Amino acid sequence: MLTSPTLQEYLGYCLIPSTKGQKMMLIVGKGGEGKSRIGLVLKRLMGDAANNGSVQKVENNRFARADLEGRLLMIDDDMDMNALPKTNYIKTIVTAEAKLDLERKGVQSYQRDIYARFLCFGNGALTSLYDHSDGFFRRQLILTTKDKPADRTDDPFLVEKMCAELEGILLWCLEGLHRLVQNNFRFTVSERAAANVDTIKRSSNNVIDFMESEGYFRFKAEIGRAHV
């Protein structure tokens, strides 16, 4: 998984206080692949600049957004598969072009710049009940993992071994950041990653396939005068 240029660029992107990339990342698998190990290593690498949270809570709980203050990364290591009832805050935080209203219990609301990026791990994609817009899906980078081999024996010390190589991992991330900046914050997106977004977009909105199917609409059909 660590050979992905998209992942390399995104992890590098999470090291700086900028949202110019205007993307969040989802890493999706069937379970047991070890994808959440990435989050544990990043937490060790970034310290207090990263925290664990929930995309669902950020969108639906008015106090959860304050936990993003001063963070560069929020890791959702077991993403809730329920469709979001709304997406306003998620989209706003991913682009972060203005200060965000934050609330804490017993404290008057205040505004802050939020630079937290989202890295989510789950067994499915992030979907919305009502928002099927291009703006919602355009903000997502979706990577899929290879299935876990049936004969693979898990290494219980994998995280510790990776953390022993934190210096090399940091340099790898910085290489991705450099490439991203050189490309004006446009991520390298493989055909497979682009297809992942398209698949999720179509599965959440059957109208797309309906409109593109043959036999329902003939946009270029000519109507003769005799039929008018």
Where does each model-flagged region fall?
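Feature primarily recognizes SF3-like P-loop helicase cores of small DNA viruses
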Residues: 1-225
